[in-house]
Curated annotation (Swiss-Prot):
It holds the Pfam family Pollen_Ole_e_1. Specifically expressed in root tips. The gene is AGP30. GO terms for biological process: regulation of root development; regulation of seed dormancy process. This is Non-classical arabinogalactan protein 30. It comes from Arabidopsis thaliana (Mouse-ear cress).
Length: 239
């Protein structure tokens, strides 16, 4: 019950007491018909002062909020499509290539060619054939150390050129053990073997790679052609 309710209750109670007192006084006044119930006269009650209530507080003004915005409706996206499953292909097998074999060389006989010169006095002692002259009938020797030591010799022509045929026991499979030597000159004034292309120690045979010249047919046999030199003799020059 609030303050106002309590005040109203007290006011009603005071009025009830006042009414009861007035009624009692009227009944028990002197000269009443009841001589035995004569009561002294009560003084009138002072006026009841009602309690002063504090002024009601002004209602609290709640802050005014702006109206809530309507919720933003997001666009409805279509359902995502299931990923396309690509077919699984079997692994690709690498192609099977035929085995590669080293080139086969037909076994042939061996022919060695070269040129022999006599150096010019200007280049005596120098490995240079500029101004040199070809030597005719110079002796060239081929030594092959294979299963059987084989030696063969030949002489140069007027152009100093020679073609030396190895023995038929020597083939192109055996040339690693073959060396060509410059042996002797018919000219006593140009007879010392020079070191040009190892003519004195033995020159290694080099195969001719030019097509059409790498082999030759002689005496019904096929020969693989190899180069050596050129070789040269040192001249005896006037001082």
């Amino acid at each position: 019950m609030g303050i106002i309710g309590k005040s109203v209750s007290l006011t009603l109670f005071a009025l009830l007491c006042f009414t009861s007192s007035v009624f009692t006084l009227g009944v028990n006044q002197p000269g009443s018909s009841d001589p035995f119930h004569s009561l002294p006269q009560h003084l009138p009650l002072p006026p009841i002062k009602l309690p002063t209530l504090p002024p009601a507080k002004a209602p609290i003004k709640l802050p005014a909020y702006p109206p809530a915005k309507a919720p933003i409706k997001l666009p409805t996206l279509p359902p995502a499509k299931a990923p396309i499953k690509l077919p699984t292909l079997p692994p690709i097998k690498p192609p099977v290539l035929p085995p590669v074999y080293p080139p086969k060389y037909n076994k042939t006989l061996v022919a060695v060619r070269g040129v022999v010169y006599c150096k010019a006095c200007k280049y005596a002692g120098v490995n240079n054939v500029q101004g040199a002259k070809p030597v005719k009938d110079a002796v060239v020797r081929l030594v092959c150390k294979n299963k059987k030591n084989s030696i063969s010799e030949t002489k140069t022509d007027k152009n100093g050129y020679f073609m030396l045929l190895a023995p038929k026991t020597v083939t192109n499979y055996d040339i690693k053990g073959c060396r060509a030597f410059l042996v002797k000159s018919p000219d006593t004034k140009c007879s010392k073997v020079s070191s040009l292309h190892d003519g004195g120690k033995g020159s290694v045979l080099k195969p001719v790679l030019k097509p059409g010249f790498s082999s030759t047919i002689m005496r019904w046999f096929k020969y693989s052609v190899y180069n050596v030199g050129p070789f040269a003799f040192e001249p005896t020059c006037p001082k």
